[in-house]
Each structure stands twice: as structure tokens, then as C-alpha cells.
Amino acid sequence: LQAKIDAAADNATITLDSDTTITETLVITGKTLTLDLNGCTLRMTGTGSVLKVSGRATLTITDSRPQNPHTGSDAGLPAGGVITGGKADKGGGILLDGGCTLKLTGGCITDCHAIGTVGGGVVLNGDTAILYMSGTARIENCTAGETWGANAIFNSGTMYADGGTVDGTVNNQGTIRLSEGAAAETVFNGTVYNRSAGTIKAGRYNETVENRGTITGGTFCGGVTDDGGTIEDGAYETVKFNSDNGAQAKEEKVLRGQKVSNPAAPTKSGHTFTGWYLGDEKYNFDTPVTAPLTLTAKWEKVPSSGGYYYYHPTTDTKADDTKGSPKTADPGVALYAALSLLS
């Protein structure tokens, strides 16, 4: 396979036609190349990264048969193209040097290991290294000497989190962002350590982000632990509570992906509060907030109380009534009846 890589022209595509075993790291240098895993397994049995990208090269990894099952000794591997078995000081799966670009659009990097502390799956080795992750690409079941050293990805460059899934810890000392016009975001299913030099601008984080750096965007379903970092306004959504009782609407900022707290019930004279509504639906406060919201209070009128009122004078100004004379009116006696109507 290395001979094919060396002989390939710039912008060529190499397609695996069978499961492939290597004993030394495959090196792509000084050219733009696409590797189609084609549902096959690329397995390292020696020591070193499975792939190394150097010399300002660009490597795109695709998988034209993502549902292809594996059999025999590989039966336990995920379906589709797989990169596996790497064992290196750093970057067990792929080591990406500064000035190089890696585009992961398909396939799975699994069961790769960093013997040292850094990056079992992929390492961006320098601030000019660039990773684009999108499509059905996955990184899973990789390890490093220390979990903070990133089982899955160690990033000191720029990662464009345009899709795909990362299972395992990530150490970010560079930037995680979104490509302009990207329709999807990478899902991170492990703890992300955002170091002091790190910036997170995009991505969906289902586990905790430990933040020493800067967060300007993203969706944080697992929450953020403040470790001396900064979270800017772009990472928050505004929830407006319109109580519809004459009081000014209240606003609350919520970290995107977190839940807004159910506030104390408002009051309105002559009415009973029935809940907060988003449009015509009663709002579920267990729902993560991912966009600006306006919640409106709904009210029911309280039935007004009613009854009869009878008034009798305490004195009578007439000494006697003329017997047998009909009374058409008596100014000293009043009878008032009020009937309540439900409204």
C-alpha cells in the first residue's frame, strides 16, 4: 500500500479492495490524496501510527461501503471502513503534522492507542494542522496514557467540527469551529478538556466540558465546568418570560444545550396561572434550550362570588299604618338581590 501511495499522482484516489494489514506507518507527504476505505479494514500490527500526514500534504478519508459487515477475527469491528491497531507515542490512529490537512468524511478510527499521554485516535501536531470532520466519520474506543491527554483527539491546530461522532476524551489547545455553511456539527460523547489556549466555537457536547480557555459557541448538553476560563455571550440563548399581567417581561440567559429553570408562578388579579406556553403547547422544562425562546403565561379567570343582600331599617317614621290600605311602596324597606354570573 505504501508503494501505491508513493506512486500516486497529486489528487489521486486509492481504493482498498480488501482488508489490509501493515507493519509500518503509512506516510502521505507532499501531495493531495484520497483514501477510500471501501468498507475494508486497515490494520496496524506493528508499532506506530497507522497513518502519518506530513510535508504539507492533504489526506481525505472516505468510505464508499459504510454498511459492509466484517467477519472472522474482525467480526467485532464496526461496519464499514475501519482504521485500527495503531500504537504510537502520540497519534495512534493518525498523526497530522503542522501545515497539513486531514479530511475525515467516513470510516471509523477504533482501537488505536497513544503509548504516551497524547491522542489515541488523532493528533493535530502543530498550530497549522487542520482537521475537517464530517459525514459518517467516527472515532471511538481509542486510549491514551492519560485521559486528559485525549483518548480520541489531541488538537493544537484547527478542527472544523462539521459532522461525525467522537467518542472519548478530547484535549483542545487549538480551535474547534464550524465551516461556513456547514449543515451539521460534530457530536462529542466524552469529556472535553478546553485548555487555556483552546477556543470552542462550535460542536455538540454531550458530556462535560472542563473550561480553562474560551467558549464562544457550541451546544453543551453535558454542561461546562468553570476551571478559570471564559464563556462569551455567543454560547448563550435568551429565554423571555412574558407574564401577560402588565409587568415587564423577564429575560434569562441559558447556556445553549442546558435547561431553563421554571420560575416562580406570576400573579394576575382575578385569574389563575395555568403554566408557561411556547406557542400553543405547554412548555416542557426538561427540554434543552438550543434557540431563543419566548414563553407566555396562560391564565384562567376566577369565577366572581355572589349572593343576596337584604336591608331592613332600624326605625319607622310612621306611627301606624292605615289598616286595609294597599301599599304601593315603602321607602323604609329595600330588598336587593344580586345573582352571580359565571364569566
Task: Write out the residue ranges for each language-model feature.
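Extracellular beta-strand-rich solenoid/capping regions of secreted or surface-exposed proteins
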Residues: 21-34, 42-63, 83-102, 116, ...
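Beta-strand-rich solenoid/repeat architectures in extracellular/passenger domains
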Residues: 39-47, 64-90, 105-118, 134-151, ...
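A cross-kingdom C-terminal cell-surface attachment/processing module
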Residues: 332-343
